[in-house]
Each structure stands twice: as C-alpha cells, then as structure tokens.
A protein has these predicted regions:
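C-terminal regulatory domains involved in ligand/effector binding and gene-expression control
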Residues: 1-52, 174-190
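Hydrophobic side chains in well-ordered alpha-helices
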Residues: 13-16, 91, 124-128, 159-162
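Positively charged, aromatic-enriched nucleic acid-contacting surfaces
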Residues: 39, 52-66, 141-143
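Active-site beta-strand/loop microenvironment that shapes enzyme catalytic pockets
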Residues: 57-101
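Short glycine-/aliphatic-rich beta-strand segments at the starts of folded cytosolic domains
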Residues: 103-121, 149
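Short amphipathic alpha-helix segments
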Residues: 116-134, 158
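Conserved short beta-strand edge segments in small beta-sheet-based binding/regulatory domains
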Residues: 136-140, 167-184
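Terminal, non-globular segments
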Residues: 149-152, 156
Length: 190
C-alpha cells in the first residue's frame, strides 16, 4: 500500500505517518520518507534491512523534483522473502506508483481579483480569465455580473489590459489580495 500526501511541515508529515502506522498497525512494515522545500529530508526503513526502503523511496521524489510531500509504504509479509534487491525494487515501485496516482502539483502565487461587468460582457471576460490560466471562483449576479477570479500572479497586468479592451474602458479589474495555491502540472506522470 502506498500513500502520498502534500505537507507543509515536519509536524504535518509526522502526523500523517503516525496515522498510517495506527491504521495499519498489523502490517509488518510502514516505511516512510518526506522532503520539504527547506531541504529537510527524513526517512525510515521501519525494520527492513538498512537502505532497502526509505532511501529508495526518497530517491523517487528527488528524481521527480518533488518537495513538501510525505510517502508511507505499508508492507504485509506474504510468505516470500524478497531479498535486498527485491525489497529495493518493491519500495521504489510502490513510491513511484503512489506518486503517479496522486499526481504532481506546483504551488504558485495567485492574484485574487474582481471585475464587475454588464451581462453582455460576462462571457468574454470569463473566457479571458480561462485563457490566462485563471479560475473563476465565484460569480455574483445583480445589476451587473461580478466575477471573482484567481489569476497566475504574472497574468494580472495582461488581464487588466484585456478587460479594458474588451469593455472599451467601462470595466476595471480590482485586485483583492494574493494567495498561494497548488496547481496540477499537466503531463507530470512518472
């Protein structure tokens, strides 16, 4: 069994590891690793021969360039001794499969903004958000349509110019803050 979860701290990683160990307390081994953006890396072979579980799992994430992640691989003994090479391959494959199933996301800075527009211009403004890789989070319908959107930070000025052009200067983008958000990377399979 392989589990991959995003984490922001060692405490969060350790909490997930402890929960897995508790859930699968009857398993022979709950091997784990985690990597954080600040360079922190930890791993455990959890009773497997040294170097056959934690480090190979860690290498999967290093090669993928992934950080802020925890991985736990739970192994039940099936009656066949795998040997060190077999264990290394099994833990590497389990970590890689779990990562592929979870997918890879990139944490980016986003600009939160609002645009109030006449109903007739709603669709072109919404399409401009999507074309720049943004996301419409909320749409409020009143005398005008207010679009609450998140845009990649670097697209803010381009979006403001597009809104001015689309609305002939009748509407403006109002920044309301910034946030960080994970975005799935296309084609990030292993």
């Amino acid at each position: 069994l392989g589990l991959v979860r995003p984490v922001g701290s060692e405490d969060e990683a350790r909490t997930i590891i402890a929960a897995c160990k508790k859930q699968y307390h009857d398993a022979r081994h709950n091997c784990w690793c985690y990597l954080l953006r600040d360079g922190t890396e930890r791993y455990s072979d959890d009773g497997e021969p040294q170097g056959t579980a934690g480090i190979p799992m860690l290498e999967v994430f290093r090669r993928a360039g992934v950080t802020n992640v925890v991985c736990v691989v739970t192994r039940y003994f099936g009656g066949v001794l795998l040997g060190t090479g077999g264990l290394l391959r099994a833990y590497t494959a389990a970590a890689a499969d779990a990562l592929a199933d979870a997918g890879i996301s990139e944490v980016r800075r986003w600009l939160a903004c609002e645009v109030s527009t006449p109903y007739a211009l709603y669709e072109p403004v919404r399409a401009a958000v999507a074309a720049l890789g943004g996301v419409v989070q909320e749409t409020q319908y009143a005398a005008a349509v207010t679009i609450c959107a998140l845009l990649p930070e670097e697209a803010g000025e381009v979006f403001a110019a597009q809104v001015r052009d689309l609305t002939a200067g009748r509407c403006a983008v109002r920044p309301v803050g910034e946030t960080e958000r994970a975005v799935p990377l296309a084609g990030a399979g292993l």
